[in-house]
């Protein structure tokens, strides 16, 4: 499954919607996504499982890439 993760680049500042970034992670569950990202230096706001149709749409963006540690 592919998950879209919305996050802020820093843990030290209050989250601001306009600064929200996103990345895509392949994992078995939302819990696994959070475990994979727990040591990263950013604040996770939301993790969303995306549908096949949503994934196809996102892949049309030339900047689309799965996160790799």
From Swiss-Prot:
It catalyses: RNA(n) + a ribonucleoside 5'-triphosphate = RNA(n+1) + diphosphate. InterPro entries: RpoY. One of its GO terms (molecular function) is DNA-directed RNA polymerase activity. GO terms for cellular component: DNA-directed RNA polymerase complex. Its EC number is 2.7.7.6. The keyword GTP-binding does not apply. Keywords: DNA-directed RNA polymerase, Nucleotidyltransferase, Transcription, Transferase. One of its GO terms (biological process) is DNA-templated transcription. Pfam families: RpoY. Belongs to the RNA polymerase subunit epsilon family. RNAP is composed of a core of 2 alpha, a beta and a beta' subunit. The core is associated with a delta subunit, and at least one of epsilon or omega. When a sigma factor is associated with the core the holoenzyme is formed, which can initiate transcription. A non-essential component of RNA polymerase (RNAP). This is DNA-directed RNA polymerase subunit epsilon. It comes from Listeria welshimeri serovar 6b (strain ATCC 35897 / DSM 20650 / CCUG 15529 / CIP 8149 / NCTC 11857 / SLCC 5334 / V8). The lineage of its organism: Bacteria, Bacillati, Bacillota, Bacilli, Bacillales.
């Amino acid at each position: 499954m592919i998950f879209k993760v919305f996050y802020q680049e820093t843990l030290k500042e209050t989250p601001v919607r306009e600064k929200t970034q996103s990345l895509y992670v392949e994992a078995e569950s939302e819990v696994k996504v959070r475990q994979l990202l727990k040591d990263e230096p950013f604040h996770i706001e939301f993790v969303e499982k995306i549908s096949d149709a949503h994934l196809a749409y996102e892949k049309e963006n030339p900047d689309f890439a799965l996160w790799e540690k």
